[in-house]
């Protein structure tokens, strides 16, 4: 018996919506990364993008445990000498709700062309509304 290998044109992708209200950042991110990659499917193939589309609503109401609200730091660099910027989780959630979740999920996906294709299937919205009703997403509880 041969091992099954999924073909890119044969992959069936579903749409799921997750309500992130009062959910912990890391727990949501790890499950989302798993589903974007397609590891929950029996036809998972490492070199083919078999994952589903994930819509996350209420990302502004995401939480972290302990003192990570003030202690967790995010860094970015402008490219110029001395151009490093630092911000906390709390400030990032106020200014860009959902970006912390996007960064967490992106860090859990493979690096390279396949990982970049996977992260494009993640849609994050700060509020409860999203423009993907036409895709009829199923509710996913984490």
Curated annotation (Swiss-Prot):
Q: Which GO terms describe its biological process?
A: negative regulation of translation; translation
Q: Which UniProt keywords apply?
A: Ribonucleoprotein, Ribosomal protein
Q: Name one GO molecular function term.
A: mRNA binding
Its name, as the record gives it, is Large ribosomal subunit protein uL13
Q: How does it assemble?
A: Part of the 50S ribosomal subunit.
Looking at the record's lineage, which domain of life comes first?
Bacteria
Origin species, per record, is Cupriavidus necator (strain ATCC 17699 / DSM 428 / KCTC 22496 / NCIMB 10442 / H16 / Stanier 337) (Ralstonia eutropha)
A GO-annotated cellular component = cytosolic large ribosomal subunit
Report the function annotation for this chain.
Answer: This protein is one of the early assembly proteins of the 50S ribosomal subunit, although it is not seen to bind rRNA by itself. It is important during the early stages of 50S assembly.
Q: Which CDD domains does the UniProt record give?
A: Ribosomal_L13
Q: Does the keyword Iron apply?
A: no
Which InterPro entries did the record assign? Ribosomal_uL13 (IPR005822), Ribosomal_uL13_bac-type (IPR005823), Ribosomal_uL13_sf (IPR036899)
Which cysteine pairs make disulfide bonds?
none
The record's listing under Gene3D superfamilies reads: Ribosomal protein L13 (3.90.1180.10)
What Pfam families does its record include?
Answer: Ribosomal_L13
The UniProt entry, under PANTHER family, shows: LARGE RIBOSOMAL SUBUNIT PROTEIN UL13M, RIBOSOMAL PROTEIN L13
The UniProt entry's sequence similarity note says: Belongs to the universal ribosomal protein uL13 family.
